[in-house]
Amino acid sequence: MSTTSNEAKKEKGQFFTPVEIARFMSEQLSTEKEDISVLDPGCGTCVLSCALIERLVQLCTVRSIRLVVYETDSGVIAYTKQALIYLAETLKNQGINFDYVICEDDFILQNYQALSSSPSLLQKDADKFDFIISNPPYFKLPKDDSRVKVTQQIVDGQPNIYSLFMAISAGLLNKSGELIFIVPRSFASGRYFRLFREYFLGAIDISFIHLFNTRKDTFAKDDVLQETVIVKGFRRDEMINDRRICISYSEGITDLNAARQ
């Protein structure tokens, strides 16, 4: 996105996903369903959701796809719309029914009730998803931010917004639904993420983690030196005694196709 400066991206915690990473993430997901629902919160130009849908269509006989994306950056929305118009035309030519919604509202403020354990407040099944794929924004939120106030059950200290995206997404999965995120590694340790970890690991069984050995390569175009990981998991509906997590690693994105386990 040459129209957005690196300074503006950093201020918004906005780092656009390289195509190589989008394809790698989409390759970790699969389904046998004919009717699929996908959520891409913080979608940017829809690189992730487009890569995922392309992958799913190649894998199986898909009859219909429902896609919901969230993006609040008015400078990006035009590109988001262009990408989805092109995707819709491509799927139409393949005989696939495709419905999509672009939400310009704040993802957290619109969906924080998904964190609730009260059945009366939980999202309807129709509002849940088979797949959630995301490269959310990364930045710390002040304690008086409205998004912090509505997510107090997973906040301890000053949270990073990406953890709120992950937690809320966990509550928006269908039964047997899967999510995959590329996020900083910071959630894995430290007091500030304690309540988030308790909630997220209680709701999601992590099945795959990809580690990058270098900080420089992942979002090189945005001049980012952030330690990031790719995390995949599925909704936990019952206790599984024999849980196995596949861990792979690469130096960066140039050797993703040769990622080692």
Residue spans for each PLM region:
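Conserved S-adenosyl-L-methionine
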Residues: 55-66
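Secondary-structure boundary motif
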Residues: 31, 58, 86-93, 175, ...
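Conserved beta-strand elements of the Class I
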Residues: 37-39
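S-adenosyl-L-methionine
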Residues: 84-120
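Signature of N6-adenine DNA methyltransferases within the class I
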Residues: 10-24, 42-50, 64, 70, ...
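Glycine-rich helix-loop-beta junction characteristic of Rossmann-like nucleotide cofactor-binding loops
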Residues: 27-33
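N-terminal, positively charged/glycine-rich alpha-helical extensions of SAM-dependent methyltransferases
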Residues: 1-7
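Class I S-adenosyl-L-methionine
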Residues: 53, 78-81, 85-92, 197, ...
